[in-house]
């Protein structure tokens, strides 16, 4: 049975770049990995493949939504380090329900029997959990991961995600494996001071600290993982992913989080330094 990870975080926090590099790091350590992009923008797997691939919704539309006419080869592409990739896609902007498409993609994986064919399956899910469709990966995941940075909005979203994981854990096996700190800047951004306090309060920990570095920006523009890039800072940028891969492929010290109520988190963050 696969190790299933569901990665969430505030919109624009860097989930896709982080997910792709984490998938690559686990693959480089010998794991057979499938990364699934769960966002209508369908750009989650771009750093692994170097292009935007056909989505589940594109393929279904081409066969008039006859599921029996779709094979896994129609929707899966192989990227860097042998990572298999899949994008759920979604309706055009301003129409339809992206969450519904994510829910249908989860069902499709079951139809193809993919849950037993990989060592690791990574769900990269957009933004906050705002509906049942986008929370569907938590029904199958062993662990949730939250990506955040050291600011108010990011931590507020992380708290709501902790609430979603805590609620799902009442009926499913999912637990929180930890928080990934992204864009860590010790000179101007306070490092991870707020995130560390938040993690301790809700009963988890920061499992990785990804630096704020131009190499990461350039890797995204190039459609490459950090492991394929050259230049100053490469080791500094790749090391956190290697360490997180080791942590997740072993037995993570996962917990059921104890989040704040919305009003309480406002008051709490204001008192942290």
Swiss-Prot record:
Binding-site residues for ATP, renumbered to this chain: 12-17, 41, 182-183
Gene3D superfamilies recorded: P-loop containing nucleotide triphosphate hydrolases (3.40.50.300)
Keywords, alphabetical: 4Fe-4S, ATP-binding, Bacteriochlorophyll biosynthesis, Chlorophyll biosynthesis, Iron, Iron-sulfur, Magnesium, Metal-binding, Nucleotide-binding, Oxidoreductase, Photosynthesis
GO molecular function, one term: oxidoreductase activity, acting on iron-sulfur proteins as donors
Enzymatic reactions: chlorophyllide a + oxidized 2[4Fe-4S]-[ferredoxin] + 2 ADP + 2 phosphate = protochlorophyllide a + reduced 2[4Fe-4S]-[ferredoxin] + 2 ATP + 2 H2O
InterPro entries, per the entry: NifH/chlL_CS, NifH/frxC, P-loop_NTPase, Protochlorophyllide_ATP-bd
Name this polypeptide is given: Light-independent protochlorophyllide reductase iron-sulfur ATP-binding protein
Species per Swiss-Prot/TrEMBL record: Chloroflexus aggregans (strain MD-66 / DSM 9485)
Gene field: bchL
